[in-house]
Design a protein with these regions (language model features):
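A compositional/biophysical signature of low hydrophobicity enriched in polar/charged and small residues
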Residues: 1-185
Length: 185
């Protein structure tokens, strides 16, 4: 079974949103034209260390602290910086097991999609939920203590989510790469 299928049309199969082709290239080029080399360096530094002092950030990008602060405020206001958060150690906090789950819904109607999305939002074990094109509807990233906890989660939460017809579970054996940093030019 192929993991990736080509979209049926712009906007995607099964109601998946998004643009394919030239529009995404235009958006990327527009973003790059609005950000200069210093903006990109600021974003790169902040991705690596969100707690860097304004003074050290200014030294890293060779601008005054006042100019850097103004740029960071503009990048935040313009939506390039969404926020700052601490990266926690899941092993030390009883969430050492990561499991990816493919979810196939019984119907693909707007009501089912909305009910599923609303139910997923309130579950802390579900860290990420992505609507995808292909042989299933959603891909979930979950974390919990161990397989016994996942088994309980599957029976009491996952299979009770609105519209779920079928799931496939992929326990992670090793996290080879785990980053939130975007590759900036």
């Amino acid at each position: 079974k192929s993991a990736v299928k080509a979209p049926l049309s712009p906007g995607g199969a099964r109601g998946v949103g998004g643009e394919w082709g030239h529009k995404s290239t235009e958006r990327r080029e527009k973003m790059e034209s609005e950000l200069d080399r210093i903006d990109l360096k600021i974003l790169t530094c902040l991705q690596a260390d969100g707690r860097i002092s304004n003074l050290k950030l200014a030294e890293a990008v060779t601008l005054s602290p006042t100019a850097v602060l103004a740029r960071v405020q503009r990048l935040t206001k313009d939506g390039y910086i969404l926020g700052y958060e601490a990266r926690l150690n899941p092993l030390k906090l009883g969430a050492g097991m990561m499991v990816f789950v493919e979810v196939l819904l019984d119907r693909t109607t707007p009501n089912v999609f909305e009910a599923f999305k609303a139910a997923v939002q309130v579950r802390g074990e579900i860290m990420e939920c992505h609507m995808v094109a292909g042989g299933f509807d959603y891909l979930l990233k979950t974390r919990m203590a161990d397989m016994a906890a996942y088994r309980d989660f599957a029976g009491t939460v996952l299979w009770q989510l609105p519209g779920v017809r079928e799931t496939r579970t992929y326990p992670v054996m090793e996290e080879v790469k785990n980053t939130t940093q975007l590759a900036l030019r």
